[in-house]
Amino acid sequence: MTMTAFSPEVVAQIARHMNDDHADDNVLIVRGLAGISTASAARMSGMDADGMDFEATVNDILVPVRIPFSARLTERRQVRTEAVRMYQEACAALGLEPTH
């Protein structure tokens, strides 16, 4: 069982940012790190101290996806570092150059 270091309000703020500003990155993360190459969309649906949760659209079906963090997070500022790491690793796995 995982523990959360983040309040529901903080999780909602992070999810809103990821979904509004990084929707394409969410898809790359799911494709590259979860190995779901047919994902056509993905939205962050939650997170805790150990990982980020997404709902991926695969063949018009919503599929839950969990991407673990590299280590347990204890502070909000660590989330950005992990999200960037996930994006960069996903790009590498897919043979793409990161655009940011």
Please state what every model-predicted region is.
Residues 1-100:
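Binding-site signature for planar aromatic cofactors or substrates
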